[in-house]
Design a protein with these regions (language model features):
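General beta-strand structural signal in soluble alpha/beta enzymes
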Residues: 83-85, 106, 111-117, 138-142
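Conserved small/polar residues in nucleotide/adenosyl-binding loops
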Residues: 158-159
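Active-site cofactor/substrate anionic-group-binding motifs, chiefly glycine-
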Residues: 48-102
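Generic N-terminal amphipathic, Lys/Arg-enriched alpha-helix
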Residues: 1-23
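Flexible, glycine/charged-enriched surface loops at secondary-structure junctions
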Residues: 24-32, 47-49
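Acidic, glycine-rich active-site loops and adjacent beta-strand->loop/helix elements
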Residues: 87, 117-121, 142-148, 152
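Glycine-rich beta-alpha loop segments
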Residues: 94-107, 114, 120
Length: 159
């Protein structure tokens, strides 16, 4: 199979524009989404790169991913956050979650954050590296919408 080389910056700009214009993402949401997807491909994680665009588009068209939604903090302590995603795209929600988590961890020595009701956030390693870049340990996990239909079921529920 022949490989195609695409300029990183051009692909990132194209993807950002596609999310902004095609899927009505706000500029900042489109920017982080494009950045993480293209970075996944650049690192060899094609399963979490730009090939996922059709999945994110289908979620928007089905109303499962709401680009204009705003996440909100619903519970907060010095070492814990719960963020209600309100079906916002996972990438901008994760950026906010990691920024707040790392600020609290620097102040208090640790922090755990839970994001609920958001969408897939791409390559988990990207988010965990945010902690490593600041000399901390970070774990990043996500769930996603159902991807497979179990036997005798009428809807996708297995991820």
């Amino acid at each position: 199979m022949e490989r195609t080389t695409v300029d990183y910056g051009k692909l990132r700009r194209y993807m950002q524009r596609m999310f902004e214009v095609g899927l009505k993402y706000p500029e900042e949401s489109a920017e982080i989404t494009a950045k993480v997807l293209v970075e996944a491909d650049a690192r060899g994680h094609a399963s979490h790169g730009v090939a996922r665009v059709s999945m994110y588009a289908a979620e928007v068209w089905d109303g499962k991913n709401v680009p204009q939604a705003k996440p909100e903090i619903v519970h907060e302590t010095p070492v814990y956050l719960v963020i209600q995603g309100n079906r916002a795209p996972g990438f901008p929600v994760s950026r906010t979650a990691m920024e707040r988590t790392l600020e609290k961890a620097e102040e208090n020595g640790t922090c755990m954050t839970v994001v609920r009701d958001s969408c897939h956030f791409g390559m988990a390693g990207y988010w965990a590296e945010q902690a490593a870049d600041r000399g901390m340990i970070g774990w990043a996990f996500t769930n996603t919408l159902g991807a497979a239909i179990p036997l005798y079921s009428d809807r996708k529920s297995v991820v």
